[in-house]
Amino acid sequence: MGLLFVELLPRHGDGGGPASAVLKCRRCRVDAASADAILSRDFRGRFGRAYLFDHVVNISLGPNEDRYLMTGLHTVKDIYCSCCQQILGWRYEKAYEESEKYKEGKFILEKARMWKEAR
């Protein structure tokens, strides 16, 4: 196994504006996503509230798994912190309902597994 590459999120908002908060793995505090990049806060995960994102960093993916979620059957991959292997949420691979297709390729991060750091 080689060296672990950790991606750090920018310290300032786009255009050098005010600094934005960063969501980090609660266990090891490695960056996972910018709070400004949350697409929706209206999701529920295994541990309560969850957020939808287009892009997250410092994760590894588990195998495809079919799951019945609140909105129907989806194929998902669990996402793990690349540093400590804590499960952080999942990525939608396939949605079987036409109304849920917008989720494909997007990520869910569970609020209970995140630490919010204001920058």
UniProtKB/Swiss-Prot annotation:
**Residues engaged in binding Zn(2+):** C25, C28, C81, C84
Q: Which residues form the Yippee domain?
A: 21-118
What superkingdom does the record give? Eukaryota
Which GO molecular function annotations are given, in alphabetical order? metal ion binding
Q: Which UniProt keywords apply?
A: Metal-binding, Zinc
InterPro entries in UniProt: Yippee, Yippee/Mis18/Cereblon, Yippee_fam
Keyword Transcription listed = no
Record family assignment? Belongs to the yippee family.
What name has this protein been given in UniProt?
A: Putative yippee-like protein Os10g0369500
